[in-house]
Amino acid sequence: MKTIIALSYIFCLVFAQNLPGNDKSTATLCLGHHAVPNGTLVKTITNDQIEVTNATELVQSSSTGRICDSPHRILDGKNCTLVDALLGDPHCDGFQNEKWDLFVERSKAFSNCYPYDVPDYASLRSLVASSGTLEFINESFNWTGVTQSGGSYACKRGSDNSFFSRLNWLYESESKYPVLNVTMPNNGNFDKLYIWGVHHPSTDKEQTNLYVRASGRVTVSTKRSQQTIIPNIGSRPWVRGLSSRISIYWTIVKPGDILLINSNGNLIAPRGYFKIRTGKSSIMRSDAPIGTCSSECITPNGSIPNDKPFQNVNKITYGACPKYVKQNTLKLATGMRNVPEKQTRGIFGAIAGFIENGWEGMVDGWYGFRHQNSEGTGQAADLKSTQAAIDQINGKLNRVIEKTNEKFHQIEKEFSEVEGRIQDLEKYVEDTKIDLWSYNAELLVALENQHTIDLTDSEMNKLFEKTRRQLRENAEDMGNGCFKIYHKCDNACIGSIRNGTYDHDVYRDEALNNRFQIKGVELKSGYKDWILWISFAISCFLLCVVLLGFIMWACQKGNIRCNICI
């Protein structure tokens, strides 16, 4: 029995001497890359879901909830629509001569003057909005033979009956309404916008009381255009106590052109003109509050950052905004392929290289070295290969933003009911554009992600090949991203391999001797694992024999009793 115990002990000692890492005349050097416990899934051309160590979201999917007042000049319409402010509704007098980059119309806005309609409302609204100003210049029209500045109880200015401040309601004087024929030249170097209207009485009696004639007519002409409107007399739905209406029209007079107004009744005359400016001002319907902040991009939901190339907040935008796409998320890979580190390394705790898995906890770089030698184990990052990968990835996000950010705004589009088919066509075109952009965005991101992953894999392979060329025949590729170094390689030696100053000639003879020297059981990797497992099994068997022998000896001495009952 003592002989068996002694042999078992000797065998274990010999076996232990041959475990990996105990040979001080060799070392192991592994190359690896950064890994995280939980990576981010991205899409590439070849794979719908591939895990990377880091990724950046490219789609802005939320707003600040408020419209920033900088750097754009925001004009809050409050209770007024832009057209009401243009006409001079009494409760919109505060908007006279105002300027803006973006006019914000609220859902609570209302008209509080004479009931009116604008046959080409959307065009007028868009024209004035893009002009960015309500600057108004009064002109002296000669309205001889009629009474001016008519008012209505439906349009109070304070406690007095009043009317739109930018329009002049003309009606009979001493039961007479002569034919009016007035001209006004444009001697300036800018376009003039004239707003005028036609009154539609609710009854024939109202018509004759105001304009004497049973039917009036209004003709407004320039060298380029002419509009003739015949009033439609008849009752309409009651609004603010009135069943009559005013139709609002507009005429643009170019420099050198002339405005001609001819009427024998029902004319709502202009008091002057608005200056038309060319610019990128706009209008937006929104109930988002206006706050003190800064943002280049504004949507009806509120301002959004424009540091991402895409947004999913709203199709309607103003300013330099990300491109609208349908996707809620598009992630751009800004790190390498993630292969989480295995928590166990087998029975003997060997280190492993990048072919098996990544390394967690590498905070100094993306690529690096781990070693195991006579001085212990260690790890260090390779800053050169890390920087090479980062330099190529860093500008990727900025390049995508430059390709996609719009330097103009997407305005609201309105059409009258008559233009319904045009509206349907326009909507189809817009939807098609969004579909195309959404597809292009997904394709662009997938291509960039594929390039990033290929790039980072390539840097890893470059570092591995660089190390292989340094070590040459002094080491053996273990097939898992590691090298078995066949000479004593302390930490200084390992450092020289990392920084590229390793001289393989210095260690060549020692490495060759160690390669061919037989130490115990030195086997090639094809049979080494088998022998180790067989040796371990024999050791366990011998230990079991020892334990069984002890039990039998104890039974013979009477120290242990064994009763078998049937």
From Swiss-Prot:
<keyword id="KW-0946">Virion</keyword>
<feature type="topological domain" description="Cytoplasmic">
    <location>
        <begin position="552"/>
        <end position="566"/>
    </location>
</feature>
<keyword id="KW-0812">Transmembrane</keyword>
<feature type="glycosylation site" description="N-linked (GlcNAc...) asparagine; by host">
    <location>
        <position position="79"/>
    </location>
</feature>
<feature type="glycosylation site" description="N-linked (GlcNAc...) asparagine; by host">
    <location>
        <position position="54"/>
    </location>
</feature>
<keyword id="KW-0564">Palmitate</keyword>
<dbReference type="GO" id="GO:0019031">
    <property type="term" value="C:viral envelope"/>
</dbReference>
<dbReference type="GO" id="GO:0039654">
    <property type="term" value="P:fusion of virus membrane with host endosome membrane"/>
</dbReference>
<feature type="glycosylation site" description="N-linked (GlcNAc...) asparagine; by host">
    <location>
        <position position="301"/>
    </location>
</feature>
<keyword id="KW-1168">Fusion of virus membrane with host membrane</keyword>
<comment type="similarity">
    <text>Belongs to the influenza viruses hemagglutinin family.</text>
</comment>
<feature type="glycosylation site" description="N-linked (GlcNAc...) asparagine; by host">
    <location>
        <position position="138"/>
    </location>
</feature>
<feature type="topological domain" description="Extracellular">
    <location>
        <begin position="17"/>
        <end position="530"/>
    </location>
</feature>
<comment type="subunit">
    <text>Homotrimer of disulfide-linked HA1-HA2.</text>
</comment>
<dbReference type="GO" id="GO:0046789">
    <property type="term" value="F:host cell surface receptor binding"/>
</dbReference>
<keyword id="KW-0325">Glycoprotein</keyword>
<keyword id="KW-1167">Clathrin- and caveolin-independent endocytosis of virus by host</keyword>
<keyword id="KW-0732">Signal</keyword>
<feature type="transmembrane region" description="Helical">
    <location>
        <begin position="531"/>
        <end position="551"/>
    </location>
</feature>
<keyword id="KW-1164">Virus endocytosis by host</keyword>
<dbReference type="InterPro" id="IPR001364">
    <property type="entry name" value="Hemagglutn_influenz_A/B"/>
</dbReference>
<feature type="glycosylation site" description="N-linked (GlcNAc...) asparagine; by host">
    <location>
        <position position="181"/>
    </location>
</feature>
<dbReference type="InterPro" id="IPR013828">
    <property type="entry name" value="Hemagglutn_HA1_a/b_dom_sf"/>
</dbReference>
<keyword id="KW-0472">Membrane</keyword>
<dbReference type="GO" id="GO:0019064">
    <property type="term" value="P:fusion of virus membrane with host plasma membrane"/>
</dbReference>
<dbReference type="GO" id="GO:0020002">
    <property type="term" value="C:host cell plasma membrane"/>
</dbReference>
<feature type="disulfide bond">
    <location>
        <begin position="113"/>
        <end position="155"/>
    </location>
</feature>
<feature type="glycosylation site" description="N-linked (GlcNAc...) asparagine; by host">
    <location>
        <position position="38"/>
    </location>
</feature>
<feature type="lipid moiety-binding region" description="S-palmitoyl cysteine; by host">
    <location>
        <position position="555"/>
    </location>
</feature>
<keyword id="KW-1165">Clathrin-mediated endocytosis of virus by host</keyword>
<feature type="disulfide bond" description="Interchain (between HA1 and HA2 chains)">
    <location>
        <begin position="30"/>
        <end position="482"/>
    </location>
</feature>
<dbReference type="InterPro" id="IPR000149">
    <property type="entry name" value="Hemagglutn_influenz_A"/>
</dbReference>
<feature type="signal peptide">
    <location>
        <begin position="1"/>
        <end position="16"/>
    </location>
</feature>
<keyword id="KW-1043">Host membrane</keyword>
<keyword id="KW-1133">Transmembrane helix</keyword>
<keyword id="KW-1015">Disulfide bond</keyword>
<dbReference type="GO" id="GO:0055036">
    <property type="term" value="C:virion membrane"/>
</dbReference>
<feature type="lipid moiety-binding region" description="S-palmitoyl cysteine; by host">
    <location>
        <position position="565"/>
    </location>
</feature>
<feature type="disulfide bond">
    <location>
        <begin position="80"/>
        <end position="92"/>
    </location>
</feature>
<dbReference type="GO" id="GO:0046761">
    <property type="term" value="P:viral budding from plasma membrane"/>
</dbReference>
<keyword id="KW-0261">Viral envelope protein</keyword>
<dbReference type="InterPro" id="IPR008980">
    <property type="entry name" value="Capsid_hemagglutn"/>
</dbReference>
